[in-house]
Amino acid sequence: MNLYDLLELPTTASIKEIKIAYKRLAKRYHPDVNKLGSQTFVEINNAYSILSDPNQKEKYDSMLKVNDFQNRIKNLDISVRWHENFMEELELRKNWEFDFFSSDEDFFYSPFTKNKYASFLDKDVSLAFFQLYSKGKIDHQLEKSLLKRRDVKEACQQNKNFIEVIKEQYNYFGWIEAKRYFNINVELELTQREIRDRDVVNLPLKIKVINNDFPNQLWYEIYKNYSFRLSWDIKNGEIAEFFNKGNRALGWKGDLIVRMKVVNKVNKRLRIFSSFFENDKSKLWFLVPNDKQSNPNKGVFNYKTQHFID
């Protein structure tokens, strides 16, 4: 099954048709209306996150045409196979020189303390949306905290449903759609010998994290040493998606999406070839005010000035 199959579309579907199909399926499988549809909801969101972006769609379409890749993914659950071979090492290996990579702009993200974007993080809303997404309700203590906000309180006093107020006030479906910004997309160079010998390949990465209990609501980086044993039948252009191995914040987790590149000689083992996080730091888990709407968040952190906003 490929991404078009998940959205019940032919591979010739346009961006407009993809958006229409996504909205239709999202309503059908959303956890709020279909308690058994949460996994399908995640899958169609993953599919939409790639196919709705013209650049990602073009890359994915080209990958479908590489060798017999399209036939393979229709007849084999690749993600299951990759996860069986996937390992996460908990300790750093001394021979992995992360400082060597840190100077490579194509490899690591720029520090958040140096970015030029002003993004506003609202921890309570992020947690509320994660709880709605994962279990369809908001914890009592968090609900009490949100009800103290003037805009929420005033809306609820007009006999509006609390959850619907939160969704509407802070654009729940926009945030769900933006989940793709937590994915990490990489290209991995492999040789035929490594594939034949089923070598173990290491993927050292820096992951962006905000923990639920992180007091200052600031991003920080952690090193993760991912590795997996290669399968003997890897083809050039094949995609492996490791769920929940990407960037993460306040319960939300992105995916690690790896595109295999078979080469005669490895020149650069690992390359981040697409990162929404680098292109736009204002999307996920952030509500950025515009000319028509003032910032409704309280006590939030401005990444441009590095200060909290009263």
UniProtKB/Swiss-Prot annotation:
Q: Which UniProt keywords apply?
A: Chaperone
**Keyword Electron transport listed:** no
GO molecular function list: misfolded protein binding; protein-folding chaperone binding
SMART domains attached to this UniProt entry: DnaJ
Q: Where is the J domain?
A: 1-66
Gene disruption phenotype: Not essential, it can be deleted.
- Tell me the domain of life: Bacteria
Which CDD domains does the entry mention? DnaJ
State whether keyword Acyltransferase applies: no
**Which Pfam families would you find in this protein's record?**
DnaJ (PF00226)
Protein name from the UniProt record: DnaJ-like protein MG002
Species name:
Mycoplasma genitalium (strain ATCC 33530 / DSM 19775 / NCTC 10195 / G37)
Its ancestry begins with: Bacteria, Bacillati, Mycoplasmatota, Mycoplasmoidales, Mycoplasmoidaceae
